[in-house]
Regions:
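Periplasmic/cell-envelope proteins involved in peptidoglycan metabolism and beta-lactam response
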Residues: 1-193, 205, 214, 240, ...
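Beta-lactam-recognizing serine transpeptidase/beta-lactamase-like catalytic domain environment
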Residues: 2-6, 68, 169, 173-219, ...
């Protein structure tokens, strides 16, 4: 009996151990499957994975194309067999395509895994191995439009700033320009590299201002203030009234409209169209600050953004209990609030798309060396930022900006448009940053454009004309 009891306990222990080992095995296999399907590309493509670049010993880095078939980056081989990465457009795509020498940035980093992977047929790979040749890497076909990118680049000129263009219904990034820029071709980059990374260099040529440039939003933030007013007063927000004398005085504070222009009697529609600082500062005093903070975070301030390229997180700090001056400043997009051009483009795209934000993306598909599709990236809905009704109401306000307000640069276009201008103060004694964010056509939006020009002055006078050139190129020139 004692042996039987001991044997029984031993059998139970063996069975328990078997179950533990089996569970561990199943868990390990499950994680292995998850890694292969979900995490492998992320880990392999990590900048910390030193082994990835060893792929270049047997694979010639693939090309990067615009969506209209223009070569944005390719590897050329000279007579001595030396490889050279070439960027035919020079500085035009420097920030979004990036560079692959001196580290990797932009698409050269984001798509590194694909560019160093080859999907040529097996026989060709074997032949390449036996003959000591490299297999051609896969290529990236991007969502970027070369003509639209060139328009943005030329329109911005030699001024500092950024231009972003999105397709609101899909999230495709159509153009992304940041200035000042640099030539990513290795021969040029090597000559200026030390100057670019010098701690005393304050030009920031390597900074992608479209994604990483944090700016006070100025009057384009009135989109957020207006939305909060709509939510708190859904039936009466249009009845808001303010008599603008050009300067709004309260206690020891004063808020000036641009150049102290007196707008006269304003309702919310007119105040938005005319970008009346006094009206929106006064409106901010009537709003629930806790609700306003919640709204800002619903619109992705202080939050991670659904983006694949490196970006800076926008900031909003006003909370319940804030003082009068902070309320006045924050309500008109000043104070400590900061935002990137890409974030404002995403918010505008959600307004243009019925309240739904589509995840911005820049790689359309991966092709092998024969031009055959290996992988395609499809539009993905990120989240709803607002209701369809709210997006429609904001759109109506933005149409008025063009039709009778500060967006007059777009008024006589062959298409309808909607937008918001902004002039953001950032340093005493310096000209304001010029903003514009908007979309066209107003009825069935096809393109969103956001523009920031550092020290450009008024948004209507400086940034809106750049957006006009972008809309013209996309809706008129490209459709011919």
């Amino acid at each position: 009996m004692k042996n039987t009891a001991a044997d029984s306990r031993a059998n139970r222990n063996i069975m328990l151990l078997t179950y533990v080992v089996l569970a561990a095995f199943v868990g390990l296999m499950g994680y292995f499957g998850y890694f292969l399907q979900v995490k492998s590309e992320e880990v392999i493509n990590s900048s910390y994975n030193a082994r990835l670049d060893r792929f270049s010993d047997r694979i010639c880095r693939g090309r990067i194309y615009s969506r209209d078939g223009q070569v944005l980056a390719e590897t050329q081989v000279d007579a001595q067999g030396q490889e050279l990465r070439v960027y035919p457009f020079g500085a035009v795509f420097s920030h979004v395509v990036g560079h692959s020498s001196r580290g990797k940035t932009g698409l050269e980093s984001l798509g590194n895994f694909y560019l160093l992977t080859s999907h040529v047929n097996l026989l060709e790979q074997v032949w390449d191995q036996l003959s000591g040749q490299k297999s051609p890497g896969d290529s990236l076909v991007t969502t970027l439009d070369a003509g639209l990118q060139m328009t943005a680049y030329q329109a911005l000129g030699d001024r500092k700033g950024a231009v972003v263009a999105l397709e609101p219904g899909t999230g495709k990034i159509l153009a992304m320009v940041s200035k000042p820029d640099y030539d990513p071709n290795p021969a040029s980059l090597d000559l200026v590299w030390d100057a670019l990374v010098d701690e005393e260099n304050n030009e920031g040529q390597l900074l992608n201002r479209a994604m990483q440039g944090l700016y006070p939003p100025g009057s384009i933030f009135k989109i957020v203030t207006a939305l909060e007013a709509m939510r708190e007063h859904p039936d009466t927000y249009r009845e808001y009234s303010f008599d603008c004398s050009g300067v709004y005085y309260l206690e020891d504070y004063s808020i000036r409209c641009y150049h102290s222009n007196a707008h006269g009697l304003q309702n919310l529609d007119l105040a938005f169209a005319n970008s009346c600082n006094g009206a929106f500062a006064s409106l901010g005093l009537e709003l629930d600050l806790a609700a306003m903070h919640d709204l800002a975070e619903q619109l992705l301030f202080n939050c991670e953004l659904p983006l694949s390229l490196p970006y800076a997180k926008s900031a909003y700090s006003m909370e319940a209990g804030a003082g009068t001056w902070e309320i006045l400043q924050t309500s008109i997009g000043q104070g400590t609030t900061q935002v990137t051009p890409m974030h404002m483009a995403m918010l505008t795209a959600a307004i243009a798309n019925g309240g739904t934000l589509m995840k911005p993306y820049v790689i359309e598909q991966v092709q092998n060396a024969a031009g055959e599709e290996v992988k395609r990236f499809l539009p993905v809905s990120a989240q709803n930022l607002m209701t369809a009704q709210e997006s429609r109401q904001l759109g109506e306000l933005m149409v008025q900006v063009v039709e009778r307000g500060t967006g007059s640069a777009l008024r006589d276009a062959a298409y309808s448009s909607a937008g918001k201008t902004g002039s953001a103060e950032f340093e005493t004694g310096k000209e304001t940053h010029a903003w514009f964010t908007g979309y066209a056509p107003a009825e069935e939006p096809q393109i969103v454009v956001t523009v920031i020009v550092e020290e450009g002055g008024s948004g209507g006078g400086c940034a809106a004309p750049i957006a006009r050139q972008m809309f013209d190129q996309y809706l008129l020139t490209m459709s011919e």
